[in-house]
Regions:
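Charged, low-complexity intrinsically disordered regions
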Residues: 1-59, 120, 239
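Conserved pre-motif I regulatory segment
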Residues: 58-96
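Walker A/P-loop
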Residues: 90-110
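Conserved Walker A/P-loop ATP-binding site and its immediately adjacent core
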Residues: 104-106, 119-142, 233-238
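Conserved P-loop NTPase motor "coupling/switch" region that bridges the ATPase
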Residues: 120-122, 165, 192, 209-264
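Conserved helix-turn-beta segment of the N-terminal RecA-like "Helicase ATP-binding" lobe
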Residues: 131-155, 246-250
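Conserved helix/coil segment N-terminal to the catalytic DExD/H
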Residues: 156-191
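Conserved ATPase-coupling elements of RecA-like P-loop NTPase cores
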Residues: 180-182, 199-213, 236-237
Length: 264
């Protein structure tokens, strides 16, 4: 196996190329010096399929992504690189890194990489009111000057008007989601949801959880990343609603809260 940084491709020499070409439509057969090779784009989706076929293909993001410097000055920490790469490889994922570990930039680096590789289009960041401007909007402005962001804040009419702007990153507080829920039905271009401080949706009986669940799981196919440094602030049972929000099809999580409660 060879990784071509120039072509951003995985090159395989196979006795039976159809083993790969029949399951990966983007794979192509090439002839190089009399050798039959298969070239596959080195992207997250193709990498996952190749791994399922038994090939030990490395994550593409660390190899091919040109990381913008944080605040225009600092390289990512190793933990941030690992986190960003992990998120890029999972359409539904949790980031449970502690406070001060740079989760915000890690998520934005991962989004930026997926956007550049045309895996996703736009992202909606759902976060506490206190972090909309000074954390998320500032991070986009300072580290990703090539991205546009808008903070959806104010009256319902104002939020809906701001949502119509053609930008890369939309930022809204969790309690403001109700004002744009219906409008998001027709926004298939917003195909990634980042829920910052996911533990705010730890109770499936609240309007917060129900609205988030509608946006994440009932409107269109969307990637969802849940971020929190304290997933179970009150009890282990806090995890159930968060799991059902981000990974509703996870068979390891009981369908009903009572069954989960009895386990933990």
């Amino acid at each position: 196996m060879l990784i071509s940084k120039e072509k951003k491709a995985v090159i395989l020499r196979l006795k039976n190329p159809s083993r790969v070409t029949t399951v990966i439509p983007t794979a192509v057969e090439v002839n190089h010096n009399g050798q039959r090779l298969v070239a596959i784009p080195h992207r997250p989706d193709e990498t996952r399929v190749l791994r399922n076929l038994g090939f030990e293909v490395p994550d593409p993001m660390p190899i091919h992504y040109n990381w913008p410097k944080a605040n225009g000055r600092f390289n990512p920490f190793d933990a941030q690189r690992e986190t960003a790469s992990f998120l890029s490889m999972h359409s539904r994922a949790f980031c449970l890194n502690g406070m001060g570990t740079g989760k915000t930039n890690a998520a934005l680096w991962s989004y930026d990489y997926l956007r550049r590789t045309k895996v996703v289009n736009k992202v909606l960041v759902v976060c506490p009111l206190s972090t909309m401007e000074r954390t998320w909007a500032d991070s986009v402005f300072n580290t990703f000057p090539h991205l546009d962001a808008v903070v959806l804040h104010g009256t319902k009419d104002k939020r809906l008007k701001l949502l119509k702007q053609d930008v890369h990153v939309y930022i809204i507080n969790i309690d403001g989601l109700a004002t744009i829920r219906d409008a998001l039905k027709d926004r298939d271009d917003i195909d990634l949801i980042v829920v910052d401080e996911l533990a705010l949706a730890r109770n499936s009986g609240t309007d917060r959880w129900k609205i988030l669940n509608t946006i994440c799981n009932k409107q269109s196919v969307r990637r969802v990343w849940g971020m929190t440094g304290s997933p179970t602030p009150n009890a282990p049972t806090d995890a159930w609603a968060q799991c059902k929000l981000v990974t509703p099809d996870n068979s390891a999580v009981p369908k009903y809260f009572s069954a989960f409660r009895d386990r933990v």
